[in-house]
Every structure is written in structure tokens, then in C-alpha cells.
């Protein structure tokens, strides 16, 4: 059983390329059955890799996307993936759609990882994440913008 990683993504590019990618993702979401057998369902990242014309066996795609929405030249969604973010999928998207760049924020508590590639904080302002169990056995989870 893997540790699960929750990630949020923002993909930004030309309105045309973002619209094409969004169309592919929405078409996959409307399917009754995934055309690539898997344990995740119709929104498995491997289905997206396959729909982009690539071999899902050569890309780390061990998870699924959720809640995709498009606004102008921006696409936003979340993923639940095993052990860490599956950025190979998004690197592939950037090769297929040269104008698109992706930004992400991910948390994988089992591996004590909090990651982002948004150095300027344009989409994800938090730079630090802390999980604490108090002596009273209370769990606290907080994000911070800086070291203070």
C-alpha cells in the first residue's frame, strides 16, 4: 500500500493549447470505462498519457486527476498519486504543448515531503508546511509563507 501524495497543479499556456488539453481531459472524464485497464478508473494519469499518443508504460503515472477546470489560458486540477507527484506526465504535456508550463504544490505526509516549483509564489504562496502532534495528542497542520 503506497503513501498517497496530494498535489495541486496550475498549467498556463496559449489559450488554444490549454483548450486542447482541457478537451482531452474532459473527454476522458465522460467515458463510462477507461480505455486503458487500470486500478484508478477513467481519470488515471496513464489514460491521459495514452490519449496524448505516448506509451503509459514508459511514464510514471501512478495516480489520477480530479476537479479539472479551465479559465482562459489556465488549467487547474488536483492529483492523488502514490509516493510523490507524477511530474513526468506534466513534463510530457509540456513537450506536446510547447507553450504550456506547469506549477505544482504537493504534500506527502508519509515521506515528510512538501514540494513546489512555484519559486515566486505566483500560484502557490506557501513555502513551508508543518505537521505536529501536541503532548495532548492533538494534530496540527499549518502552511507558512516564510520562516517566521
Go through each PLM region and give its residues.
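Intrinsic low-complexity, intrinsically disordered or marginally ordered coil/linker segments
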Residues: 1-148
Amino acid at each position: 500500500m503506497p503513501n498517497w501524495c496530494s498535489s495541486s497543479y496550475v498549467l498556463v499556456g496559449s489559450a488554444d493549447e490549454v483548450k486542447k488539453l482541457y478537451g482531452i481531459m474532459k473527454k476522458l472524464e465522460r467515458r463510462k470505462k477507461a480505455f486503458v485497464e487500470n486500478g484508478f478508473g477513467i481519470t488515471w494519469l496513464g489514460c491521459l498519457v495514452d490519449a496524448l499518443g505516448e506509451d503509459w508504460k514508459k511514464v510514471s503515472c501512478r495516480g489520477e486527476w480530479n476537479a479539472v477546470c479551465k479559465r482562459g489560458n489556465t488549467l487547474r486540477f488536483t492529483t492523488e498519486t502514490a509516493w510523490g507527484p507524477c511530474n513526468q506526465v506534466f513534463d510530457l504535456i509540456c513537450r506536446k504543448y510547447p507553450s504550456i508550463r506547469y506549477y505544482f504544490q504537493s504534500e506527502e505526509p508519509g515521506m515528510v515531503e512538501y514540494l513546489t516549483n512555484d519559486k515566486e509564489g505566483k500560484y502557490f504562496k506557501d513555502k513551508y508546511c508543518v505537521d505536529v502532534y501536541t503532548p495532548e495528542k492533538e494534530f496540527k497542520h499549518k502552511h507558512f509563507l516564510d520562516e517566521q
